[in-house]
């Protein structure tokens, strides 16, 4: 894929490293991978919080505290069908509830834009959109940008170019800007080994490989989006 879960997980880890109390929410409600990327057991999920109508403050101990004491994880529902019970009104409630206990919220969204995502986009302060120089990824990113433009959400979008230095891409960074008609605010280098190892360990590379260029790139991104944010982007399935 384009790497949005990797970016979301490490962006949240970077906020926490900076000293901000951060909640990473897996909003890929049916097939989210945040729990795997952070090596947490989804004992308390988005579904549990919303369907049990929990007041967050006295139940903060249910959240999973990660490696950094400032980073908390709210995984996607355990069963894909549980996502069907979550509606747009609940999205607003979720953000309002979480905002009372955290400095920063980072939502990892699914590849497909649905009504719940659109509600989340409208309520967010920033939308971090991840893409690569893969032509199929750029085509799908353009489609998503067009949707958000019609909803007058373009001003919230921050475009990130992942794996920008991968030798397999023939498109250069300037071409991306021309194709999508939007500035790229940050680039992230291509390092399969670091990313793969960090996922297998369940520890964001911000912590497991803190001195790698890819970790520095995420920290630079964090300095540009120091607000609640949604991380989205179209994944491209390789055949």
What are these language model-derived features?
Residues 52-118, 138:
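Cytosolic-facing regulatory segments adjacent to core modules
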Residues 1-23:
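Walker A (P-loop) phosphate-binding motif
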Residues 132, 157-169, 187-193:
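G-domain G4 guanine-recognition motif of GTPases
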Residues 200-239:
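NTP-binding/hydrolysis catalytic cores, primarily Walker-type P-loop NTPases
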Residues 15-73:
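Phosphate-binding loop that captures ATP/GTP phosphates
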Residues 163, 177-205, 218:
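Beta-strand-loop-alpha "switch" segments that mediate conformational coupling across diverse proteins
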Residues 142-154:
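Conserved C-terminal guanine-recognition region of P-loop GTPase G domains, centered on the G4
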Residues 124-142:
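Conserved Switch II/interswitch segment of TRAFAC-class P-loop GTPases
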């Amino acid at each position: 894929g384009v790497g949005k879960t990797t970016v979301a997980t490490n962006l949240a880890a970077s906020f926490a490293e900076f000293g901000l109390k951060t909640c990473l929410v897996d909003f890929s409600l049916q097939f989210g991978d945040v729990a795997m990327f952070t090596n947490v057991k989804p004992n308390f999920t988005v579904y549990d919080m919303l369907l049990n109508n929990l007041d967050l403050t006295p139940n903060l101990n249910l959240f999973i505290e990660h490696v950094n004491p400032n980073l908390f994880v709210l995984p996607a529902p355990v069963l894909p069908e549980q996502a069907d019970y979550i509606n747009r009104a609940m999205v607003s409630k979720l953000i309002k509830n979480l905002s009372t206990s955290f400095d920063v919220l980072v939502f990892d969204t699914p590849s497909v834009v649905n009504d719940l995502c659109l509600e989340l986009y409208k309520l967010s302060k920033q939308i971090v959109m991840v893409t690569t120089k893969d032509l199929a990824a750029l085509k799908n990113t353009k489609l998503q940008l067009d949707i958000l433009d019609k909803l007058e959400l373009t001003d919230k979008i921050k475009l990130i170019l992942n794996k920008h230095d991968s030798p397999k891409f023939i498109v250069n960074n300037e071409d991306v800007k021309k194709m999508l008609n939007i500035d790229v605010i940050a680039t992230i280098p291509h390092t399969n080994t670091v990313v793969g190892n960090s996922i297998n360990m369940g520890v964001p590379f911000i912590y497991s490989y803190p001195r790698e260029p890819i970790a520095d790139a995420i920290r630079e991104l964090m300095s540009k989006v120091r607000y609640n944010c949604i991380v989205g982007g179209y994944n491209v399935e390789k055949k």
